[in-house]
Amino acid sequence: MANNNSAKKRIQIAERNRLQNRSYKSAMRTLMKRCLTAAGSYLEKPGEEAKANLQQNINEAFSKIDKAVKKGVLHRNNGANKKSRLNAAVKKLIEPATKR
């Protein structure tokens, strides 16, 4: 347990930041899942509207990841890996739809 006031305050700040980071990561994961769902719906019914929806979801997810890196929630390499894996997963889902 902290003995002086500054240490107690640092504990409070660390807990506040932990909760904010947790919330931000949760929102980021939600956007990534939404992106994969949009890719699945594009696979079922390929069309301009589904493609636009997919592109919008990808842009939102990438933006959220970039902001997480900028805020220090994620390390920049971790952010780059998340973007790369998300893009690869979306392409893997979309490839069969484009070959039709």
From Swiss-Prot:
Protein encoded by which gene: rpsT
Example of a GO biological process term: translation
InterPro entries assigned: Ribosomal_bS20, Ribosomal_bS20_sf
Ribosomal protein in keyword set: yes
Protein's job: Binds directly to 16S ribosomal RNA.
Species assigned in the record: Prochlorococcus marinus (strain MIT 9211)
GO molecular function, one term: small ribosomal subunit rRNA binding
Gene Ontology cellular component list: small ribosomal subunit
Family named by the database record: Belongs to the bacterial ribosomal protein bS20 family.
PANTHER family referenced in this protein's UniProt entry, alphabetically: 30S RIBOSOMAL PROTEIN S20, SMALL RIBOSOMAL SUBUNIT PROTEIN BS20C
Key words of the record: Ribonucleoprotein, Ribosomal protein, RNA-binding, rRNA-binding
Annotated SUPFAM superfamilies: Ribosomal protein S20
Pfam families from the UniProt entry: Ribosomal_S20p (PF01649)
Superkingdom of this protein's organism: Bacteria
Protein name: Small ribosomal subunit protein bS20
